[in-house]
């Protein structure tokens, strides 16, 4: 909300490329950022229109290129009608993971400078988990990305990981640094890794 200036902040500052975000026009600022949420909202419309948001400046080639880039083309082709498949209200015809993939394609098409993933992988089904992991890596490459996650496999390759407990920072570092300490991150990672081994067996 603050990065998109849905609310104006009273203290501190947020910069984008070294420029205070309050110096940007709202339209330019919001086109420079993309947010992928856990609860993806889709309109009762085709997949294509849900990706482009009916923006006439976005071409079919861009949509197909973005879909390939996040590794979702096979998923789209398996649907009746492909990009013309109607997802119905709130995407009720799709699984949680499939809705997430569409939101990833949408974000890729708009090519934001800053990407925010807010628990975007929290409720995905096993069928699309690997697709989401690949899509996350490809979507975050080469751009500033802020990832809010409880699923630590999502953030393992992040340059910097900040561990919060009730809104307070308790640890900071990359994955290797945090695993080298006997802290909250390492304990949670080991629990999640053990759970994934049991699930796979």
Regions found by a protein language model. Give the residues of each.
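ABC-family ATPase nucleotide-binding domain "signature/switch" substructure
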Residues: 1-6, 30-39, 47-50, 64-72, ...
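Conserved ABC transporter NBD signature motif
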Residues: 12-19, 29
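Conserved H-loop
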Residues: 73-80
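ABC-type ATPase nucleotide-binding domains, specifically the catalytic core motifs of the NBD
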Residues: 51-60, 74
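Conserved coupling/switch loops of ABC nucleotide-binding domains, chiefly the family-specific signature
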Residues: 10-13, 166
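C-terminal boundary and immediately downstream tail of ABC-type ATPase nucleotide-binding domains
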Residues: 180-201
């Amino acid at each position: 909300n603050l990065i998109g200036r849905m609310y104006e902040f009273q203290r501190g500052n947020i910069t984008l490329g070294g420029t205070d975000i309050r110096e940007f026009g709202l339209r330019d600022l919001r086109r420079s950022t993309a947010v992928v949420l856990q609860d993806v909202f889709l309109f009762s419309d085709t997949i294509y229109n849900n990706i482009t948001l009916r923006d006439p400046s976005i071409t079919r080639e861009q949509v197909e290129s973005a879909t390939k880039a996040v590794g979702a083309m096979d998923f789209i082709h398996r649907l009746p009608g492909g990009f013309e498949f109607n997802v119905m209200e709130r995407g009720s015809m799709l699984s949680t993971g499939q809705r997430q993939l569409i939101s990833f394609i949408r974000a890729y098409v708009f090519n934001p400078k800053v990407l925010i993933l807010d628990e975007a992988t929290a409720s995905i089904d096993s069928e699309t988990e690997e697709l989401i992991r690949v899509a996350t890596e490809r979507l975050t490459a080469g751009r500033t990305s802020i990832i809010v996650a409880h699923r630590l496999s999502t953030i393992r390759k992040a340059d910097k990981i900040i561990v919060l407990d009730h809104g307070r920072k308790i640890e900071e570092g990359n994955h290797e640094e945090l695993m080298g300490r006997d802290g909250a991150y390492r304990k949670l990672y080991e629990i999640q890794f053990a759970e994934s081994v049991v699930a796979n067996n």
